[in-house]
A protein has these predicted regions:
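Glycine-rich phosphate-binding P-loop
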Residues: 71-86
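Conserved catalytic network of the ASCE P-loop NTPase/AAA+ motor domain
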Residues: 61-62, 90-92, 118-122
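Conserved nucleotide-sensing/catalytic segment adjacent to the nucleotide-binding pocket
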Residues: 100, 107-151
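Conserved small/polar residues in nucleotide/adenosyl-binding loops
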Residues: 157-163
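Short beta-strand-centered segment that lines the nucleotide-binding/catalytic pocket of NTP-utilizing
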Residues: 94-103
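Pre-Walker A adenine-sensing motif
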Residues: 54-60
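Charged, amphipathic alpha-helical linker segments immediately N-terminal to NTP-binding catalytic cores
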Residues: 4-46
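Pre-Walker A (Motif I) flank of P-loop NTPase domains
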Residues: 64-68
Length: 163
């Protein structure tokens, strides 16, 4: 925690301000100092977890909206670890986790968004999506697997589908 307390890590540069237009190219992808993950976890997690618990209580009490948190990253980037270390501290009755891997036979028998819609959280609850419907577009476009995917025809030959 010493590095964090001395200000050797500037977490503000990783934050998105409310109503600010986001340009992901401007965000750094590497940390600027060598800091132990445990130090960061011990320094920030207790406060963040308490804030998340409070937000979850408010979301549940208002029962107006459901919240989706999408974790989109490459394999082994820490999506499962994030679910286990961050969201495991919330009330499990109000949190669901859906992992979107290759579509199952049942999912292929339905329209493109069926499996996503099926996983949406009810009002007052939080749904954590391990990957998203973008995965089907991103992976097939990047790895040239369109012929094996179940993409809508409007995306198959569109040059700006990933934009």
């Amino acid at each position: 925690m010493e590095n964090i307390k001395k200000g050797k890590i500037d977490i503000d540069r990783y934050r998105v301000k409310e109503n600010e237009k986001v340009n992901l190219k401007k965000f750094p992808t590497k940390r600027d100092v060598d800091i132990d993950k445990g130090e960061v976890k011990n320094a920030f997690f207790p406060e963040v977890i308490e804030q998340l618990k409070l937000y979850q209580e408010k979301l549940y009490a208002q029962n107006t909206y459901g919240l989706i948190i999408v974790l989109q990253a490459m394999d082994a980037a820490g999506k499962d670890g994030t679910v286990n270390h961050v969201f495991a501290n919330l009330d499990p009755g109000g949190v669901s986790v859906a992992s979107f891997k290759q579509p199952t036979t049942e999912e292929k028998d339905h329209d493109y968004m069926w499996r996503i819609n099926k996983a949406l959280p009810p009002r007052g609850n939080i749904g954590i999506f391990n990957r998203s419907h973008y995965e089907d577009v991103i992976v097939t476009r990047v790895h040239n697997l369109i012929s094996t995917g179940q993409l809508p025809s409007c995306l198959l030959y569109t040059s700006d589908a990933a934009d």
